[in-house]
Every structure is written in structure tokens, then in C-alpha cells.
Amino acid sequence: MQDRQKAQDYRALLLADTPLIDVRAPIEFEQGAMPGAINLPLMMDNERAAVGTCYKRQGADAALALGHRLVCGDIRQQRLEAWKAAYQRFPNGYLCCARGGQRSHIVQRWLQETGIDCPLIEGGYKALRQTAIQATWQLAQKPILLIGGCTGSGKTQLVRQQPNGVDLEGLARHRGSSFGRTLNPQLSQASFENKLAVELLKINAHQTLKRWVLEDEGRTIGANHLPECLRERMAQAPIAVVEDPFALRLERLREEYFIRMHHDFTHAYGDEAGWQAYSEYLHHGLFAIRRRLGLQRFAELTDTLDRALAEQLSNGSTDGHMAWLVPLLNEYYDPMYRYQLEKKAANIVFRGPWQDVANWLKAQ
């Protein structure tokens, strides 16, 4: 066990999906955490704030004493039981606090008093975070190929099929468009970046990489920003463009926006609440681009959406949605993407239907 006491091989820890018992306060965990970490705080947000104020006014010894007074008795025992249960569930896990300082050492000592010898991360979350940032910068230097195409071209599916493909939208829990949100909330920016770094490390470790295959994304995917080092490389990367028939794109979007999302919402919340959430999801997607559509056009498409939802609720048909989706593609999404693609025309190395692009990728 001794060699695990103060782990410092941070890349190996990230590659192994090492369980982390993160004892930072919930607010710290929400701001940024490593994939697979579970948050079992030594101090809750209000307790941490009180200790921090005490530290500034009275010094370290007084702050430490206050911390022990706040986390004592039943509170201490409840948290200790939670840490014990977590270690029993993840015997290969590590304790982690912000910098590998007092919080993880205190929890480690309390666990040792119960007979559990749980190692900790030397340097804490900050060290793991810095490792993730460095790994992303380093791995982003490898060649990149982008998959482009208008909305509904099946780009994400194509990326997922590549052994060296990185599904940025999957990592961001968002499909990129105003209708791109999923039932899973997006991670914080730091947590997204950490997850991306681990994904890059894993793929790099298991593939003989000539290049990464990524979807042609903007600077943001929903609320998450792509790391600047990756964006800079993507801006220079060659692009293979999927050009599928409009009707085929519509069918993909029907499946994605209407059939699958309706299923997911009702599966998660039940028929009535799920339908309400699904309706709000579509309305929110349209509302998000109202200024670019113009308020009159937005109002017209909203009325059409309402009629389509009424038809779907009545007989299950999603055909009515085409009456607002088709003009939305023709008037907004397609012109916007084509304008963006024109600025990168010199980077286009191949274009064709989905299957032709897939075959071309295999031949590279």
C-alpha cells in the first residue's frame, strides 16, 4: 500500500479511470472535477466559507480549530461512514482535495483510525487539472481532420465510427445547434475540458494515431468552449464535407429531434410531464434564435410548431414538424453553415455523400 500513499503519476491515474473520493466542498466540485470523481465533502459550502473567513481574520490555527468544531459528533460520523462506504466500493480509489493539503490528510487520518488505509493524490485536483490542460495542448498538436456538412448530415455518427474519432458533442452533452441540448445537463467548463483530456489520452494510448478525426465545430458547443489550443489547430485543419440529399437530412433530424427526444423525455418523466418537457425543448430551441430569424418569422414558425405538436399529440405523427423545420433549414441553418464553410474553402479535401466520405476515410 505504501507506493500508493501519495500518487504523482497523474496521467496514469487519469488513463486508468481511477476512482477519486473528492472531499472538496460542493461548490468547488461543481466548478470543476475529474471524470469518475464522487463528491463526499469534508466541509459543506457554508462550513468552508466560515473557515475561510476565520483564516483571513484569525489565522490558520483558529481556522483549523473552527473546522473541527463544525465537523464533529454526528456530522463527523455521518461523513466518515460515507467515506468508508466509498472506499469499500472503490478499494483502488484515492482521496482528493484541492491541493493535496489538510482536507485530504484529515480524511485520510480519520479513515486510518477505523482501519482503512486510503491513499491520496499528491497535489490534489489542481495537479490533475494541470495535467489535463498539458495533455490537451500536447495531443492537439497531432494532425486533425474535420468532418463538415450541414445540419442533419450524420457527421457525429461518422466521427464515432472512426477509431481515432473524438465525439466533441458527446463529451459536451450537447449537439451544437439551438436544439442540441440533451436530458443530461452540460458539465462546467473545467469538467468538460478534463473529460476531453482524458478521452484524448485514452484514444492516443490505444490507437496508432496518424491524426484525430473531429466534427467541424464552432468555438462553443452549447455552454462549453473548446480549448483554444484545439480551436487553433481545427481552424487550419483539412475538411471532408458530407453532402447528402435534403430529404435524407430531414429524416435524420426527424429521428433525432422529434422521435428520439420525445422518447427520452417521456421515458425520463412519464407521459404527461415528458410531453410538456419535450414541447418546451422544441420551443426553447426556436426561441434561442428568434432575433436571427426576425420576430415576425419567429412568430410564424412558433405557430407552425404549435400545430405540429398538437398533431403529434393527437395521432403520433411527426410530419407536421416538417412545415417549420424545412424553412428553418433553408432560411437559417444551411445559409449560415455554407457561409462559414466558404471561408474555409481552401481547407476542403473531399466532399460527397455520407457513404462516400466514410469510404474515403477508410482509404486514408
From Swiss-Prot:
GO molecular function annotation: transferase activity, transferring alkyl or aryl (other than methyl) groups; tRNA 2-selenouridine synthase activity
Residues annotated as signal peptide: none
Cross-referenced Pfam families: Rhodanese (PF00581)
Top-level lineage group: Bacteria
Active site: C97 (s-selanylcysteine intermediate)
Keywords, ordered alphabetically: Selenium, Transferase
One example of a Gene Ontology biological process annotation: tRNA wobble uridine modification
Domain Rhodanese intervals: 14-137
Catalytic activity line of the entry: 5-methylaminomethyl-2-thiouridine(34) in tRNA + selenophosphate + (2E)-geranyl diphosphate + H2O + H(+) = 5-methylaminomethyl-2-selenouridine(34) in tRNA + (2E)-thiogeraniol + phosphate + diphosphate; 5-methylaminomethyl-2-thiouridine(34) in tRNA + (2E)-geranyl diphosphate = 5-methylaminomethyl-S-(2E)-geranyl-thiouridine(34) in tRNA + diphosphate; 5-methylaminomethyl-S-(2E)-geranyl-thiouridine(34) in tRNA + selenophosphate + H(+) = 5-methylaminomethyl-2-(Se-phospho)selenouridine(34) in tRNA + (2E)-thiogeraniol; 5-methylaminomethyl-2-(Se-phospho)selenouridine(34) in tRNA + H2O = 5-methylaminomethyl-2-selenouridine(34) in tRNA + phosphate
EC number annotated for this UniProt entry: 2.9.1.3
Function: Involved in the post-transcriptional modification of the uridine at the wobble position (U34) of tRNA(Lys), tRNA(Glu) and tRNA(Gln). Catalyzes the conversion of 2-thiouridine (S2U-RNA) to 2-selenouridine (Se2U-RNA). Acts in a two-step process involving geranylation of 2-thiouridine (S2U) to S-geranyl-2-thiouridine (geS2U) and subsequent selenation of the latter derivative to 2-selenouridine (Se2U) in the tRNA chain.
Classification via PANTHER family: TRNA 2-SELENOURIDINE SYNTHASE
Similarity-based family: Belongs to the SelU family.
Subunit structure: Monomer.
Protein name: tRNA 2-selenouridine synthase
Native source species: Salmonella agona (strain SL483)
Designated gene of the protein: selU
